[in-house]
């Protein structure tokens, strides 16, 4: 019989490196699953009865953007639940929920059903921000930049590989089976998270939860955190503004070429490849010199790369500049996330990261709209000048926010 005075056995410490590895695979699978269906999304919309060029463009834009819109709405709710119930259960909820929705998408019979399911996908999403929150609350603070930079490469890798694999699968098996394959990938993500990610979390009752006002009052620097949310949104606006016109711009540069799709795909992919290489290294550098310096410096360098993109004469020149731009962009969101974790406690990390995700989703919606509007009125090249101005504003805005409190005060 155990003596009453015998000390309790402490639980095994969390192996944060293993959790980081498994979360990376989860983000990779999630990124791949989302991008698997992107190459043929307009084609699938067409099979659901949408005809006519204008109608097809409108519905394709709607089914693409509605996911981000509903994700922005739902993220704060899921973030609050993560702070109450734990981050692992939110990862499981997201992976399983998205898997079920993907199956239903494969059975959609009309465009309205598909649109509703795309909205539901946004409502049930949130794997990546919850993975960020989980890892951010477990890693040593002096390794935050490296760990979050490494984690970000998971989603980027999946997003790079997904369109290629999705296109091959669609050509081989048809459009609907790809949704079922995507659902299987997400279910695999659910199984891996269930068995291999560990979290020691004490659930918090609803009455003991901090409300939104108390969450911001608990932050070390609430104004800076709000500035970082806006910074995240503008980063996504700048990234997304180029997406609608990239293929058309490449066609303008390449002239009559037989392999336009291949060249455009390469130029679209090279920033992600560069981000894979740069994010962990710049994150590690940020741990040494401060993530705020990395953030502002990389945005300033991005401006210098965007301007000549408007002046290039060949696809090769554009590809080289986009590779360098990707190396800069790979450091931006991990630097923001590192600064967020410096300024919040583990108690509210789920909500802070979910608010940041909401701002990111707003940027994902508005960026392509900005690029399309500018190109329609002023031409493709003007988009790069406008995007450079947006990034320049973001660099100045971020620098101003960060100067209001020194780095050491943020991490103490």
Swiss-Prot record:
Q: How is this protein named in the record?
A: Multidrug resistance protein MdtG
InterPro entries referenced in this protein's UniProt entry, alphabetically: MFS, MFS_dom, MFS_MdtG_subfamily, MFS_trans_sf, Mutidrug-R_MdtG, Tet-R_TetA/multi-R_MdtG-like
Residue ranges spanning the membrane: these are 20-40, 62-82, 96-116, 119-139, 150-170, 177-197, 225-245, 260-280, 294-314, 382-402
| One MF term in the entry's GO annotations | transmembrane transporter activity
Tell me one Pfam family matched here: MFS_1
Keyword Transcription regulation assigned: no
Annotated keywords: Cell inner membrane, Cell membrane, Membrane, Transmembrane, Transmembrane helix, Transport
Q: Where in the cell is it found?
A: Cell inner membrane
- Species whose genome carries this gene: Rahnella sp. (strain Y9602)
Q: Name the family the entry cites.
A: Belongs to the major facilitator superfamily. DHA1 family. MdtG (TC 2.A.1.2.20) subfamily.
**Topology with respect to the bilayer:** Multi-pass membrane protein
Q: Name one GO cellular component term.
A: plasma membrane
User: Which cysteines are disulphide-bonded?
Assistant: none
